[in-house]
Design a protein with these regions (language model features):
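PAPS-dependent sulfotransferase catalytic core
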Residues: 1-118
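PAPS-dependent sulfotransferase catalytic domain
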Residues: 27-38, 110-128, 161, 165-241, ...
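Conserved phosphate-donor/acceptor-positioning beta-strand/loop module used by diverse small-molecule
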Residues: 137-138, 148-172
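C-terminal accessory extensions appended to soluble enzyme cores
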Residues: 282-310
Length: 310
């Protein structure tokens, strides 16, 4: 539990940059969530079956949500939203779901338990969108996957996985932007490379525990990029939904609203293939050896390499 909440604190600070809220607020939300995990007994279990998308940051969860979100039966907010984190932040509820102040007040008055509150947030959103299925994307869903399955045992979890070398290279300078007084501005980030590797390994291992569940699926970012039609057919079959025509899939970006936020800055753009294999030019020989030592065997297990001779 200490490791989980420690990871959450780091992620909350990153979210603070993205959402433009103070670090103080981010830490407060972390402590509230931690207190709930420690003290809340399993009093409420939701029957809702949301589609939950997660994975190591910079692994393609935004692309996965964009492709899933164009399905006519699915309601999916364009901005990332963690189903059990930030759920009582008024600004986020308003900006992501379009809830009015009155609707938010009613939700908070009626539902004190976090899991119950989250369920009713999703129900209200589906009602407003006229849909029967909801999909939510946030990279850090993978960090709390155990808690999510505990309170939403019927959820379908889509774990997006990317070559750890590319993900680590991207994580090193993430986030590149931050929100200041409502404006998106450049942000200089230099995360330690070993931290980036550990983050990727941790996220992969969190998901591996659920491989035997029929409500969990792993999807490679590279497959989404190189073969979106067949990959999405596999995903929609997993979700029990009809597949979408290939031409509509490839034009997914045309269906997104022209509104940019830090979490979805790539929204509205076609599939970009050039970042696959970026590690070949980004990583030094020393960093390659570091990755082999820390995560090389996991890379082989995921079939990104046949051995450590790369």
């Amino acid at each position: 539990m200490q490791k989980l909440t420690g990871n959450l604190k780091k992620h909350r600070i990153m979210d603070a940059l993205i959402y433009g809220i103070s670090r103080k607020t981010a830490i407060f939300e972390t402590l509230r969530f931690r207190a709930w995990l420690f003290t809340k007994k399993l009093k409420y279990t939701s029957n809702l079956n949301p589609i939950v998308i997660g994975g190591c940051p910079r692994s393609g969860t935004t692309l996965a949500r964009s492709l899933i979100g164009i399905h006519p039966e699915i309601a999916s907010p364009k901005n990332e939203y963690n189903i059990l984190m930030w759920i009582k932040n008024n600004n986020i509820l308003e900006s992501i779901f379009g809830f009015s102040a009155e609707e938010i007040s009613t939700l908070k008055t009626k539902h004190k338990d976090l899991a119950c509150f989250a369920e009713n947030v999703l129900k209200l959103y589906m009602q407003k969108e006229g849909k029967q299925v909801v999909a939510l994307k946030h990279p850090f869903h993978i960090i709390i996957i155990d808690e999510l399955f505990r309170y939403f045992p019927n959820m379908r979890f889509i774990h997006v996985i990317r070559d750890g070398r590319d993900a680590s290279c991207s994580l090193r300078t993430h986030p590149k932007r931050k929100m200041v007084e409502g404006e998106i501005v450049p942000n200089t980030t230099k995360n330690p490379f070993d931290w980036c590797i550990r983050r990727w390994v941790s996220c992969i291992n969190q998901g591996k525990k659920w491989r035997k569940s029929d409500k969990y699926i792993e999807v490679k970012y590279e497959d989404l990029v190189n073969d979106p039609a067949n990959t999405m057919e596999k995903i929609f079959k997993f979700l029990g939904l009809k597949a979408i025509a290939e031409d509509k899939l490839l034009d997914f970006y045309k269906y997104e609203k022209d509104e940019k936020h830090l979490q979805n800055i790539e929204v509205g753009k076609p599939i970009y293939r050039k970042n696959i294999g970026r590690w070949k030019k980004d990583m030094t020989e020393k960093e390659k050896e570091m990755f082999k030592r820390m995560a090389g065997r996991l890379l082989v297990e995921l079939k990104y390499e046949n051995d450590l001779d790369w």
